[in-house]
Amino acid sequence: MDRVAKAREIIEKAKAENRPLVEPEAKEILKLYGIPVPEFKVARNEEEAVKFSGEIGYPVVMKIVSPQIIHKSDAGGVKINIKNDEEAREAFRTIMQNARNYKPDADLWGVIIYRMLPLGREVIVGMIRDPQFGPAVMFGLGGIFVEILKDVSFRVAPITKEDALEMIREIKAYPILAGARGEKPVNIEALADIIVKVGELALELPEIKEIDINPIFAYEDSAIAVDARMIL
């Protein structure tokens, strides 16, 4: 089965259940398109939370998985730097309890678990559909750069590798990525690759109205999508 058919299966299931895509589903779709994501598992109970955390390897991150909870931090649904089985058990309990308190009627699927990654340079890649031009892909540096300074670049899909490299060089904060002031430069090629693939995804899956991959951690040798949200 090709990537479009596999992604459609995930999308159709969510549509049939009249709910948004949850983080593990969004990451599964990114994986189908060759966009790197951390290895993850979804634990439905305490035992699985401990087992999967051990398999993935401490320290890990745990986040609530629920179609009704979009802003996980607001719900107290995120725990980072979990170092052992005891902490994993405790984190699972706390997250589930917090989520119940936050939204008593929410459907709680459990938690997504992935390895705590070393801090990279945070960047964002997004996609919106313009009524006139079709799918437009956005690139910017994470945190205040996008939210406050609105330092972003856009291109309409399809996007070539050259377009993607231009998008990256266009933002005012580019020197930070290029290794200004003795900082280590990040892998621009790996970022360009993600931008191109988001463009392909947008063209092949018109059911997805919006994509927000935030943050992507960019390193010297690679780039990895840490969190992802897709709107149908």
Swiss-Prot record:
Residues 27-63 form the ATP-grasp domain. It is an enzyme of class 6 (ligase). One of its GO terms (molecular function) is metal ion binding. Activity is dependent on magnesium. PROSITE patterns: ATP_GRASP. It catalyses: acetate + ATP + CoA = acetyl-CoA + ADP + phosphate. It comes from the Archaea. Optimum temperature is above 90 degrees Celsius. Its EC number is 6.2.1.13. Pfam families: ATP-grasp_5. Optimum pH is 9.0 (at 80 degrees Celsius). Optimum pH is 7.0 (at 55 degrees Celsius). It is found in: Cytoplasm. One of its GO terms (cellular component) is cytoplasm. Keywords: ATP-binding, Cytoplasm, Ligase, Nucleotide-binding. ATP binds at S53, G54, E55, I56, G57, Y58, P59, V60, V61, M62, K63, I64. Belongs to the acetate CoA ligase beta subunit family. Heterotetramer of two alpha and two beta subunits. Catalyzes the reversible formation of acetate and ATP from acetyl-CoA by using ADP and phosphate. Can use other substrates such as isobutyryl-CoA, propionyl-CoA and butyryl-CoA, but not indoleacetyl-CoA, phenylacetyl-CoA or succinyl-CoA. Seems to be involved primarily in the conversion of acetyl-CoA to acetate. Participates in the degradation of branched-chain amino acids via branched-chain-acyl-CoA esters. This is Acetate--CoA ligase [ADP-forming] I subunit beta. It comes from Pyrococcus furiosus (strain ATCC 43587 / DSM 3638 / JCM 8422 / Vc1).
